[in-house]
């Protein structure tokens, strides 16, 4: 029964909210996609104009 144990519920809510936000932000910003290099982009653009029909 929570009435018998006066726990600071607001403090617990703030702590859990901060940890949840930190966890989500770490997961979001930890993924770094590989960006293509400029030489690869030039090759892709040249090869894409070679139509086979």
UniProtKB/Swiss-Prot annotation:
It is a single-pass membrane protein. InterPro entries: ATP8_metazoa (IPR001421). GO terms for molecular function: proton transmembrane transporter activity. It comes from the Eukaryota. Keywords: ATP synthesis, CF(0), Hydrogen ion transport, Ion transport, Membrane, Mitochondrion, Transmembrane, Transmembrane helix, Transport. GO terms for cellular component: mitochondrial membrane; proton-transporting ATP synthase complex. Changing residue 26 to M: In strain: HW00, HW09, NC37, NC48, TT00 and TT01. GO terms for biological process: proton motive force-driven ATP synthesis. It holds the Pfam family ATP-synt_8. The chain crosses the membrane at residues 4-24. The keyword Protease does not apply. It is found in: Mitochondrion membrane. Changing residue 32 to I: In strain: HW00, HW09, NC37, NC48, TT00 and TT01. The keyword Transport applies. F-type ATPases have 2 components, CF(1) - the catalytic core - and CF(0) - the membrane proton channel. Mitochondrial membrane ATP synthase (F(1)F(0) ATP synthase or Complex V) produces ATP from ADP in the presence of a proton gradient across the membrane which is generated by electron transport complexes of the respiratory chain. F-type ATPases consist of two structural domains, F(1) - containing the extramembraneous catalytic core and F(0) - containing the membrane proton channel, linked together by a central stalk and a peripheral stalk. During catalysis, ATP synthesis in the catalytic domain of F(1) is coupled via a rotary mechanism of the central stalk subunits to proton translocation. Belongs to the ATPase protein 8 family. This is ATP synthase protein 8. It comes from Drosophila simulans. The gene is mt:ATPase8.
């Amino acid at each position: 029964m929570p009435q018998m144990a006066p726990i600071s519920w607001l403090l617990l809510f703030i702590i859990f909210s901060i940890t949840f936000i930190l966890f989500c932000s770490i997961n979001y910003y930890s993924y770094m996609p590989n960006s293509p290099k400029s030489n690869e982009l030039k090759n892709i653009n040249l090869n894409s104009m070679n139509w086979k029909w």
